[in-house]
């Protein structure tokens, strides 16, 4: 399986992203590199490997809450397909 430039354009449309032609080429190459790596992982024999519930023995390890800067509201609204004043406008879901 491989990713084409058209695949990248389609995914970008779904994610409401826009890329230059150079960025599309770069994304295509990078996604194909990732897929090639995943295909290599599929070649591994895992028949004798015991399934894990967690990657390590530690459970419920949480990071401390820290206040960090976020995207400005005006920049976030620019990414929305529709907005009203400073709010996202979304389709009605509940009748």
UniProtKB/Swiss-Prot annotation:
Allows the formation of correctly charged Asn-tRNA(Asn) or Gln-tRNA(Gln) through the transamidation of misacylated Asp-tRNA(Asn) or Glu-tRNA(Gln) in organisms which lack either or both of asparaginyl-tRNA or glutaminyl-tRNA synthetases. The reaction takes place in the presence of glutamine and ATP through an activated phospho-Asp-tRNA(Asn) or phospho-Glu-tRNA(Gln). It catalyses: L-glutamyl-tRNA(Gln) + L-glutamine + ATP + H2O = L-glutaminyl-tRNA(Gln) + L-glutamate + ADP + phosphate + H(+); L-aspartyl-tRNA(Asn) + L-glutamine + ATP + H2O = L-asparaginyl-tRNA(Asn) + L-glutamate + ADP + phosphate + 2 H(+). This is Aspartyl/glutamyl-tRNA(Asn/Gln) amidotransferase subunit C. Signal peptide: none annotated. One of its GO terms (molecular function) is ATP binding. It comes from Chloroherpeton thalassium (strain ATCC 35110 / GB-78). Belongs to the GatC family. InterPro entries: Asp/Glu-ADT_sf_sub_c (IPR036113), GatC (IPR003837). GO terms for biological process: glutaminyl-tRNAGln biosynthesis via transamidation; regulation of translational fidelity; translation. Pfam families: GatC. Keywords: ATP-binding, Ligase, Nucleotide-binding, Protein biosynthesis. The keyword Protein biosynthesis applies.
């Amino acid at each position: 399986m491989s990713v084409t430039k058209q695949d990248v354009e389609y995914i970008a449309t779904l994610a409401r992203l826009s890329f230059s032609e150079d960025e599309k080429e770069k994304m295509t190459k990078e996604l194909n590199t990732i897929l090639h790596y995943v295909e290599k992982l599929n070649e591994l024999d895992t028949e004798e490997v015991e399934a894990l519930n967690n990657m390590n023995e530690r459970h419920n390890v949480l990071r401390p809450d820290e206040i960090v800067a976020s995207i400005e509201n005006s920049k976030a609204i620019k990414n929305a397909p529709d907005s009203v004043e400073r709010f996202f406008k979304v389709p009605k879901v509940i009748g």
